[in-house]
Amino acid sequence: MPRGPASLLLLVLASHCCLGSARGLFLFGQPDFSYKRSNCKPIPANLQLCHGIEYQNMRLPNLLGHETMKEVLEQAGAWIPLVMKQCHPDTKKFLCSLFAPVCLDDLDETIQPCHSLCVQVKDRCAPVMSAFGFPWPDMLECDRFPQDNDLCIPLASSDHLLPATEEAPKVCEACKTKNEDDNDIMETLCKNDFALKIKVKEITYINRDTKIILETKSKTIYKLNGVSERDLKKSVLWLKDSLQCTCEEMNDINAPYLVMGQKQGGELVITSVKRWQKGQREFKRISRSIRKLQC
């Protein structure tokens, strides 16, 4: 299948005999955005959200009102985990049509995502966001976008959907479920610097890593070795390189977790995470192991 701006333009215009009237350049932000002329910019390599998208140039200001590439880069990174969740095959296409709308020489108008593209992505991805405590934002409400009989970025046809045989995403090492006996649990506890029962207050993403801010009042300390109370007062843990893998074990921001990890370069890095399920046999074993821990 041909790729690039030309093929994308053909896809967008396939059901149109003419371009029709412009629907306005900007959907969001201050009214004066609509008077600012957009211009084409190369999509930078460090715009990870849109890495591998099938066009090279984007418009600024974009459809979210970002006027500089710095603004785009700062805001786009927070959406990478949603793409990594693979809740819908067109999540990246939808988000990039807003953060980095395609810029075509043949067209002065900024092309918006179609209403149906938004609806399909929202239906599949809003529950994933909700599990982490984040509602679908107002700025992405689908009523803002044109119907499919207008000029817009469409939902992929079934020919373009990810095949069922697509390789499963890699699971983060710290999040892999393991069948451990008491000796295994003791060994894991002893080789780590800390073991905590936590609840999550906030999750943010910095570069390739997940920053986990803890609810301080719900924290239970089981083990500290080389980690001070002062370190824990920061109430910040890190899951390294987590944007390159998935962590289904930690997909509910309201659940308690047992986390173990090590102090690395002044940061508390998680090496093991388990959702705490009261009464489950595994956690009864872990509690027993912690009480008689002798490393």
Swiss-Prot record:
Transmembrane segments: none annotated. The keyword Cell inner membrane does not apply. It is found in: Secreted. Disulfide bonds join C40-C103, C50-C96, C87-C125, C114-C152, C118-C142, C172-C245, C175-C247, C190-C295. GO terms for biological process: anterior/posterior pattern specification; apoptotic process; BMP signaling pathway; branching involved in blood vessel morphogenesis; canonical Wnt signaling pathway; cardiac left ventricle morphogenesis; cardiac muscle cell apoptotic process; cartilage development. Residues 172-295 form the NTR domain. Gene3D superfamilies: 2.40.50.120, Frizzled cysteine-rich domain (1.10.2000.10). Highly expressed in the eye. Weaker expression in heart and lung. Pfam families: Fz (PF01392), NTR (PF01759). Keywords: Developmental protein, Differentiation, Disulfide bond, Secreted, Signal, Wnt signaling pathway. PROSITE patterns: FZ, NTR. GO terms for molecular function: endopeptidase activator activity; enzyme activator activity; receptor ligand activity; Wnt-protein binding. It comes from the Eukaryota. GO terms for cellular component: extracellular region; extracellular space. Residues 1-24 form the signal peptide. Residues 35-155 form the FZ domain. Belongs to the secreted frizzled-related protein (sFRP) family. Soluble frizzled-related proteins (sFRPS) function as modulators of Wnt signaling through direct interaction with Wnts. They have a role in regulating cell growth and differentiation in specific cell types. SFRP2 may be important for eye retinal development and for myogenesis. The FZ domain is involved in binding with Wnt ligands. This is Secreted frizzled-related protein 2. It comes from Mus musculus. The lineage of its organism: Eukaryota, Metazoa, Chordata, Craniata, Vertebrata.
